[in-house]
Every structure is written in structure tokens, then in C-alpha cells.
From Swiss-Prot:
This is 4-hydroxy-tetrahydrodipicolinate reductase. Keywords: Amino-acid biosynthesis, Cytoplasm, Diaminopimelate biosynthesis, Lysine biosynthesis, NAD, NADP, Oxidoreductase. (S)-2,3,4,5-tetrahydrodipicolinate binds at H159, G168, T169. Catalyzes the conversion of 4-hydroxy-tetrahydrodipicolinate (HTPA) to tetrahydrodipicolinate. Its main location: cytoplasm. Gene3D superfamilies: Dihydrodipicolinate Reductase, domain 2, NAD(P)-binding Rossmann-like Domain. It comes from Shewanella denitrificans (strain OS217 / ATCC BAA-1090 / DSM 15013). NADP(+) binds at R38. Belongs to the DapB family. Its EC number is 1.17.1.8.
Amino acid sequence: MTTKVRVAVVGASGRMGRVLIEAAKHQDVITLGAAIERQGSTLIGADAGELAGVGCVNVAICDSLDNVKDDFDVLIDFTSPDASMLHLEWCLRHKKPMVIGTTGFNHAQKEQISACAEQIPVVFSPNMSVGVNLMWKLLEVATAVMGQDTDIEIIEAHHRHKKDAPSGTALKMGEIIANTLGRDLEECAVYGREGITGARDRNTIGFSTIRAGDIVGEHTAMFADIGERIEITHKASSRMTYANGAMRAAFWLYDQNAGLYDMQQVLGLS
């Protein structure tokens, strides 16, 4: 491919939106084609690059995907579950590929994403970081070797503004561990503990959540036995790691057929 893939960023003025715009500015194979904000925003008409602090990129923020449908190839969405579903429906109508980094979807929404992906290409991942996706592969190995004989705990920490808990990344960690052990996460997960809980059931997977300050994202899976424990940890110090992963996903997705993909496939890990 000789031409750059044009991406649209929805939620352009948000924390992640601005980082996505910055990431697009510094990509060799990606260019920013459109930036979208909610109707009524005072930022409509502003230059997206100026908003993100990377200088003028000659892309004005608009309030409707309809107005820029011919200006981009792939939509990138890190907004909210309800907003993402509306954007997905728009992409379905206009046959646009979509990268979804939003977390907090319910079961019905996930089913709808899968259904839409039968007609358009979709990358859907709770975490676009290359490091996190490598961690997920390491979890499979650790679980296969020692998961049956250890107490497994997942600890995650994020900034005080994050709305969903546990994080989508933590839940994905739990799903990988449970699937490797042949268990159902819905049946074996324990979310927090309080009071007199009794002895720990080794067949459970515990989750602990921290919300504090400006923590970008930290995730640890602990495999604890008598006398030793293994901890697999990923710490993000900047949202740029997620944004760069999303750009990589958008470039990869542009040439794909309709289907539901994840970052493991984008990175060639599965």
C-alpha cells in the first residue's frame, strides 16, 4: 500500500481522543481524515491538531459523521458503550471498517458488535497495547503450567475518572485464565471481598480494583502457591501506547474482509 490510511477519531476532545489525534500526526502509514465531537460542543470548527497540541493538521472538528463520510477510511472509537453502538450502526450503514477500544459493554451490546462484524471489518479489543496483548499470551503459558495448583488473583488500577470496574483488560485476563483451565469465568470469578469470607476456594479467580489519581493503567495476574508466587504485570505510563496500537489496528484492518478481529490477530499472536 502506497497511500496512507485515513482515520476518523470520534470523541476528539476527550483524553483518549486527543492522544489518538497526536498519534495519527506521527504515523508514517496513517493520516487523520476527520475528527468528530458531540453536537453543541464549543470546539466545533477548531483544528484537531491544535486541540491535541501538535500544531495545525488542517482537519476541522465537526459534529456529524455524515459530513465527513468521504474523508476517512477507518473509524476509531474510544468513547462510551452507548456512543460506540451508535457509531457502529453508522459504520454498518456506510460499510466503513471500525476499531473499537471502548470498554464496559454489556452482553447484548457485544452480541450486536459480533452481528455487525458479519458485514463490516471490526477490530474489537479491551486493550490495544502491544505489551498487554503479549501479557495475555504469557498468561496462557503460566496458567497451563501452574494454574491448577495456585491461587489466582487479578489486580488492576486506573485513574479516578474510569467508569467501569473491573477494567475490560482485567476481565479479558480472567477469561484467558478461565478458558485455559476449562472453567466458566461467570461461575468462578470473585469481585472483591468483605467481612468473614472463610477459606479461599482455589477454583476461584479473584479480582481487586483500584481507582486513584491519574494512574493510566496497571494490571497484575498473581499465581500464588505455598512458598512462591509468580506475578505477570503490565504498567502503562502513557495513553500513547493504546493510541499507537489503535493506529496499527486501523492500518491492518483497512485491507481485511468483514469479520470480528482482535489485537492478537492484528499482531500475529493468534
